[in-house]
Amino acid sequence: MAAPRATDEIDIAARATISYSSEDPAHPIENLLDERSGPGGTRWTSARADTIERIVVEFDQPQTISRLDYEVEETMRDRTQEVRAEVSDDGGRAYRQILVQEYNFSPHGATFQREEQRVNLHRVTHLRLTIVPNKNGSGTASLTALRLFA
């Protein structure tokens, strides 16, 4: 289901370049931005199991960010995925951590998580997400949606 775009939402596709360490061709990085979020939405998935992955959003112009939203869904297996968010205001030379969050998934319990993190960030040139697919075993990194707000 497409989430309506808020007036203060940053159009990541129009204002940034996204790089990533890997993607499953059936679940490409573009799925993060396609507005089909929520349970059952499209998703980005790593092409490599048991590998820590990175997604870097490089903005065309420095951005002010007041909120970071992302979603994760796992319906098939038990796993604990960790997401770390870091920002740079110097063109990607140095980053500072703004968020570390773990999500515990179980097919018979929690299968969907949405994070809405309020922040007060200025002149952001890069946002880097590091995804640990499973802190306690095997798994593949994935994210369902990524939204940023000015």
Please give the residue ranges for each predicted region:
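Disordered, acidic Ser/Thr/Pro-rich linker "stalks" and the adjacent N-terminal cap
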Residues: M1-D60, E73-R77, R147
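Trp- and acidic/polar-enriched beta-sheet ligand-binding modules for extracellular glycan
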Residues: I10, S21-P25, R48-I52, E74-A150
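Short loop/turn positions at the edges of beta-strands in beta-sheet-rich folds
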Residues: F59-P62, L121-R123
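Short glycine/proline-enriched coil/turn segments at helix->beta-strand junctions
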Residues: Q61-T64, V100
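Short beta-strand/loop motifs in extracellular/secreted proteins, especially
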Residues: Q63-S66, Q81-V83
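Short edge beta-strand/loop segments characteristic of extracellular beta-sandwich folds
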Residues: D69-E71
